[in-house]
């Protein structure tokens, strides 16, 4: 008697693929003169949601989508709450266009803040970086990799503190001797470990922004 051993067909396995929602779009334009970049800024005006950056003939046009802008706005709310709890004045300057004709560099951060130098710009409607100080703090939300080097732009403009949030991790950089170094604590906010801010963004998705902001204020008080 001959016994045939038949191999049973393997069951098809379901493969789950996690899709990451698009948070922003980035367009790169090359071989653009500084004069053309300035003309683009003038033509596009201020009533837009795109953010532009320029370095060495390259223009990046970033358009924020919901995840990007939601993170940006909520972090801004927490920064303002921090200032209030610490007794710091703050002038929110938003996506202020930061350009220096003499340097040929420019950028528009997601958010920017005058804190240490707030009194110097308190009543100003326009900022001229050849006369006025740059923002003390800028925030860039970067779910995708920028196509221009923001370090070079903000180093040239001499922004003292630079925050980068990639959707998961918040990194803090401070300017010293012409270059940025990553630090654990923000010099602006002292002992408050602001690198923990991302967990409050996650909490807000479950508990709501107002409830999370109240919890954040209580958390900050524990470090004052």
Predicted regions mapped to residue ranges:
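Gly/Pro/Ser/Thr-rich low-complexity, intrinsically disordered segments predominantly at protein N-termini
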Residues: 2-160, 164-224
